[in-house]
Curated annotation (Swiss-Prot):
GO terms for cellular component: cytoplasm; mitochondrion. Keywords: Cytoplasm, Hydrolase, Inflammatory response. GO terms for biological process: lipid homeostasis; negative regulation of NLRP3 inflammasome complex assembly; phosphatidic acid biosynthetic process. InterPro entries: AB_hydrolase_1 (IPR000073), AB_hydrolase_fold (IPR029058), Epox_hydrolase-like (IPR000639). Belongs to the AB hydrolase superfamily. This is Protein ABHD8. It is found in: Cytoplasm. It comes from Macaca fascicularis. Residues 135-146 have a biased composition (Gly residues). Residues 147-158 have a biased composition (Basic residues). Its main location: cytoplasm.
Amino acid sequence: MLTGVTDGIFCCLLGTPPNAVGPLESVESSDGYTFVEVKPGRVLRVKHAGPAPASAAPPPLSASSDAAQGDLSGLVRCQRRITVYRNGRLLVENLGRAPRADLLHGQNGSGEPPAALEMELADPAGSDGRSAPGSGSGSGSGSGSGGRRRRARRPKRTIHIDCEKRITSCKGAQADVVLFFIHGVGGSLAIWKEQLDFFVRLGYEVVAPDLAGHGASSAPQVAAAYTFYALAEDMRAIFKRYAKKRNVLIGHSYGVSFCTFLAHEYPDLVHKVIMINGGGPTALEPSFCSIFNMPTCVLHCLSPCLAWSFLKAGFARQGAKEKQLLKEGNAFNVSSFVLRAMMSGQYWPEGDEVYHAELTVPVLLVHGMHDKFVPVEEDQRMAEILLLAFLKLIDEGSHMVMLECPETVNTLLHEFLLWEPEPSPKALPEPLPAPPEDKK
């Protein structure tokens, strides 16, 4: 009862309605949204739009290998060796030819990846999750106690990756393609409005959920409901419900972590990944010195200042247009309790450099150069550690680049969806010998 009264008071003070709790079963609402109960009492609002489903049942969530014999279009050989040393060093060796030379038109970046990349593993205890400042460019030169490091240079574990992937063009008319959009802390599916409308017009099937406590999803009043693992299981449930044969994950900020999680869990179903201002490939660890560790009542009193700070840091400009975008996108519009629980629940030690280096899915990284939350060095480091990665910088954008520059973002995303690499030389068949000439 006290919680309900408190929520009502907060609602009056903030001038926003409390998070709606949907029905206990999946139900289509009159405005085109679906309320999905991912577990008892935990209901997420989902925007599911696109072409009408085909009469045939979708393929099961399992690996499939239906490529026609002799068809080598988009076939790529993924080969790399990942070595973790006991002294905290990481060595990534690219043994094959990754299709980085086949860059998208207008792409920032250059040619082939280095044959080997060596870096220091980030210390989770000293990091602040994805929103923390960059921890360096990941060069191979370490500092201090070089001799002791060399003596301790013994492999702790070695991971070998050797597989073939078929990366094909994802077109809107293809019934086996689904685009998943996952927002970050404080947002809602409304931040994707321009992207959802754009891709639905092109014939794509799109799925965009509200995270728990955000938008119109249910908002449990228990902090444990907002840990990374709890939210990741929500996204797993949504993915398993709507996934088809070729699925593309698009994440923004904290939402990138859930895309990475799903790509790691379902490598045969995730066809491509797009990371927008997601940060570096470091394990998530909440900061104990963060302002979000203050009591909920204090955070509520500071909410006007936090909203203004988000506007200053999240947008390249702070005019009337940006304020309207912030309001329409329902960004940074959650209760103080949910905000505090979300920030303190960002604990994911498994999501380190090794975890990201194991991904074999092609990734497009989009970064707004005016972003004050995520330094460009973090996305550059992410591009270095991933096997198949393209980094695109948008000069006029910031953290909320999909709201600021929707046409540019839509074009980049669409080009990446249509991109298909040339087959790897190792995947090509040996040329047939020329027939002998007839002697006359």
